[in-house]
Amino acid sequence: MPMIETVNLTRKYGDLTALDNLNLTIEEGTCFGFIGPNGAGKTTTIKILATLLKPTWGEARVDGHVVGYQNHLIRPIIGYVPDFLGAYDDMLVSEYLEFFAACYGIHGEKRMRVVGEVLELTDLVSKRKSDVNGLSRGMQQRLSVARVLLHDPKVLLMDEPSSGLDPRARIEMRELLKELRRMGKTILISSHILFELAELCTAVGVVEQGKLIFSGGISEMMDRAGSGSMVHVVVDERPQEAAALLKQVRGILKVTLEREEKVVRIDVTIDPKSGMPISDIPSRLIAQGFRVARFSHEPMNLETAFMRLTKGIVS
């Protein structure tokens, strides 16, 4: 049984469709990256799974329990980390965690032990007596993670946990998430920092305009977006002739023309199995009398695949 599953999940806000028949499956123990532009429906999906929103229609399940009907069974097994920290004024870190531990029904010596364990896991022991509102953004995000770990949930729902963090805090958050993955947690994480997701996640989903346009492994996503690295070339004149010449070259999978401000850019996809050096592209054009004004190489990675998928190249 999947740990997270949505079936034709739809959410409307008046005339706006935030989620449009989203069908998503996440297996237990998966670290799943949720990728999409702003307004694509990522936060809405996470809030539904966190039982904070009801679907307009369709269904969402967490560990087999249906959102909206079995919320009392879902809430004890999830931890929701929004992109902000909600805290009361004049509260110490230890008081903050003890308060939420009590909300989860953790009392007495067990509560003190659990609070100590999550402080150690999130490297916040030295901040135990610090004021919550005086913490840095990175420390506050780690405190949010500590809060949701108090009751040892099966599922973590994380909405932009690295948003607004400085480089050091992002690295520390990434290492913490890796540790949670090693602990076997099922993690759904939305982020705009795609290279971090490539390091963390075993699978990704791409959502655009409320629709899921891809779900699967990272290597599968790259294959879907188009194998091979891409080379961008701009010639001074006759771009159509230059493109026609390149289409005849063995080892080139695809050649397209893209209008870019005042010039026409030639996009060339090279077959990774061909062994063709990328320098062959401008060399061949120059040998045929073309003047190359600009040349750049775009290796295939998660960011490149995302851009291709969400520009309508595949969807």
List the model feature ranges, each with a label:
Residues 152:
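Conserved catalytic motifs of ABC-family nucleotide-binding domains
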Residues 58-69, 73-74:
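Conserved ABC transporter NBD signature motif
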Residues 131-138:
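Conserved ABC ATPase signature
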Residues 98, 102, 109-127:
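Conserved ABC ATPase "signature" region
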Residues 156-159:
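Catalytic Walker B motif of ABC-type/P-loop ATPase nucleotide-binding domains
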Residues 174-270:
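ABC transporter nucleotide-binding domain
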